[in-house]
A protein has these predicted regions:
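Conserved Walker
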Residues: 121-124, 164-169, 185-186, 202-219
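Terminal, non-catalytic protein-protein interaction segments that mediate quaternary/complex assembly
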Residues: 51, 60, 148, 187, ...
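Short, well-ordered alpha-helix to beta-strand connector turns
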Residues: 175-177, 220-221
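Short secondary-structure junctions
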Residues: 12-15, 155-157, 204-207
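N-terminal nucleic-acid engagement/recognition segments and initiation subdomains in replication
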Residues: 1-88, 99-103
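Short, intrinsically disordered, mixed-charge
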Residues: 117, 151, 198-205
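P-loop NTPase catalytic core of nucleic-acid-dependent motor ATPases
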Residues: 65-176
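Conserved AAA+/SF3 P-loop NTPase catalytic/coupling segment centered on the Walker-B
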Residues: 177-201
Length: 221
């Protein structure tokens, strides 16, 4: 189809597997931008200027097809890292939390490994799932500590805006973020704690949004 060939010649599209957003860049480039309504209209008008009948319907079908590449920002960040130099940085990070729990460092280390494994779609045995609970006075920096656990390029996939009274919202947050912080966990809606534990222990969460659209589990590396 002439319209599809035009798209493949002029731009590269990829789908963010976390947010569901479609990004585009000029063919051969790597400066990906969000495919907004304005960007869609520009593509259609530029195609028409070259005599190509690219319609909004064709573009929409192309965007929501398996012909474009899935992109996992967490995988990209992990792949950009240098080979590990043998330095245990996780222990230093864990020691920023003052605690009397002698197992804290070991458990924190295991939790971080589980978190990164989930980012890449790897299975985590449910009986071994760990969820840290940090307890302390207000203003001690508990939430701030959680916020800096992700590198700057991935911090848009962190949230502490969770309402436990909404199961649908929690489901969506689990599949669209890399790190969730349930702030004031003991202060609000503790009767839903079992549901939260269930959601966070699933190694392959699936969210079905309105109108029957399903976000599938993220693929493994």
């Amino acid at each position: 189809m002439e319209a599809l060939n035009y798209l493949k010649r002029h731009c590269s599209l990829r789908r963010n597997v976390l947010s569901g957003e479609t990004m585009f860049a000029p063919q051969g480039g790597d400066d990906y931008q969000l495919l907004t309504r304005e960007a869609r209209n520009t593509l259609i008008l530029e195609a028409a200027n070259e005599g190509i009948a690219l319609t909004d319907e064709t573009l929409e079908r192309f965007v929501h097809s398996t012909l474009i590449t899935d992109w996992n920002p967490a995988e990209e960040w992990l792949d950009s890292l240098d080979a590990w130099d043998g330095t245990d940085r996780v222990t230093d990070l864990a020691n920023r939390i003052i605690t009397s729990n002698p197992d804290w460092v070991a458990l924190f280390h295991k939790w971080m490994l589980q978190m990164v494994a989930r980012w890449t779609g790897r299975e985590v045995t449910q009986r071994d799932t760990i969820v840290p609970v940090i307890v302390g006075q207000y203003g001690y920096g508990k939430t701030s500590f959680c916020n800096i656990l992700l590198p700057p390029s991935l911090r848009r996939y962190y949230t502490d805006q969770i309402k436990l009274r909404s199961n649908a919202e929690v489901h969506e947050l689990v599949v669209t973020n890399l790190l969730l912080c349930i702030d004031e966990f003991y202060q609000e809606h503790t009767d839903q704690a079992p549901a939260v534990r269930y959601l966070l222990s699933r190694s392959t969460p699936v969210f079905r949004s309105a109108y029957g659209v399903t976000r599938l589990p993220r693929r493994p590396m």
